[in-house]
Amino acid sequence: MTVITVSLEKKQYQVKIDRRLHQEIGQAVSLVWTPRRIALLTDSHVGPLYLTAVQQQLEMSGFEVLPLQVPAGESSKSLKTVGELIGKMAEKGFTRDDGLIALGGGVIGDLGGVVASLYMRGIALIQIATSLTAQVDSSVGGKTAINLSHTKNIAGTFYQPDLVLVDPTYLDTLADRDLVEGYAEVVKTSVLAGGSFFDLTGRIYGVTDIRDNAEELSTRAVAYKAQVVMADEKEAGQRQFLNFGHTIGHAIELLAHGELRHGEAVAIGMIAMSSRMTRDGLTPASLTAALRARLETVDLPTTSDLIGTPAFFKHMVNDKKNRGGRLNLVVLKDIGQPMIVQKAIVDMPDFINENEGNNR
């Protein structure tokens, strides 16, 4: 078992990575929580596969479990769903001494984090990550969020879990497309980290390679993210680097109305930004080519006709990284050398469209 400790100013917790964790959930939870009521949140995809087994293990370990299931997909990351879940927990008499476990991928992790942070001003939270996106990225670091109609992840909190469990065997039931979109976050982290991690993603050529190397990919990605989060928990500095590809990615993800997965949109965003900065002479052309190759070899998209449209820029204005009319854009000086470039929102159409031929 790999154990990565996240040590913050006011909290410390462990991320455990092992292929046997799905059989040891009750024991793992008992090490950090005393017996209590647990709201076990999942979705309509993960629930039929794993909810019963997890619930039984928790109950055998002395916990009282309230199973909560929401429809799978981004539509559940809403204020309406948050209100419904909080209402169900209140009806069952949950108190501040109880807890919530998010059993699922990025959507459930985000949603569960928001609910846990808001219920009675905060109850204990554990993340059990079942998708690659969650295992390598979203379950670690305490960022939680829901969507409003025109903006992704616009309402949320920083709320750290008490424990994160990552079992790569959960990926066995994940569809190839869902696996690959999570791999986009792995590539992102590897180019930020550089070194042997970036070399590793250069040896991944397809879905089989992702599955075969899932444990190492998760370990490398979580170790890097934990290091960044410990240095900058609230995203005041270097944690912003983890947003590489996301400013453009979030905008086109919303415009695609479900046709693009999150990781697919991030892949497009990374190449769009790197190509633009290569044109300016900041990002080496060889880096952009290496990044593109890592994404395209697993069939991730790297272009979109949605970039540069009026609706695209409207979504960028609403981006949560908009600070005083300026966007902090993450760009790469080299492998393992991210930096922030500030651009005024009003200048973004010229900045993006000047290079649109390379992105369409």
From Swiss-Prot:
Positions that bind NAD(+): G106, V107, I108, G109, D110, T130, S131, K143, K152
Compartments reported by the entry: Cytoplasm
Cofactor needs: Co(2+); Zn(2+); NAD(+)
This protein's record includes keyword Transmembrane: no
Molecular functions per Gene Ontology: 3-dehydroquinate synthase activity; metal ion binding; nucleotide binding
Gene Ontology cellular component terms for the protein in this record: cytoplasm
Pfam families: DHQ_synthase, DHQS_C
Isomerase listed as a keyword: no
InterPro entries given in the database record: Dehydroquinate_synthase, DHQ_synth_AroB, DHQ_synth_fam, DHQS/DOIS_N, DHQS_C
SUPFAM superfamilies noted in UniProt: Dehydroquinate synthase-like
Annotated pathway: Metabolic intermediate biosynthesis; chorismate biosynthesis; chorismate from D-erythrose 4-phosphate and phosphoenolpyruvate: step 2/7
Positions with a binding annotation for Zn(2+): E185, H246, H262
EC code: 4.2.3.4
CDD domains to which the protein is assigned, alphabetical: DHQS
Biological-process GO terms, alphabetical: amino acid biosynthetic process; aromatic amino acid family biosynthetic process; chorismate biosynthetic process
Alphabetical UniProt keywords: Amino-acid biosynthesis, Aromatic amino acid biosynthesis, Cobalt, Cytoplasm, Lyase, Metal-binding, NAD, Nucleotide-binding, Zinc
Principal EC category: lyase
Cofactor note: Binds 1 divalent metal cation per subunit. Can use either Co(2+) or Zn(2+).
Main location: cytoplasm
Catalytic activity: 7-phospho-2-dehydro-3-deoxy-D-arabino-heptonate = 3-dehydroquinate + phosphate
Record family assignment: Belongs to the sugar phosphate cyclases superfamily. Dehydroquinate synthase family.
The protein's role, per its UniProt record: Catalyzes the conversion of 3-deoxy-D-arabino-heptulosonate 7-phosphate (DAHP) to dehydroquinate (DHQ).
Protein name stated in the entry: 3-dehydroquinate synthase
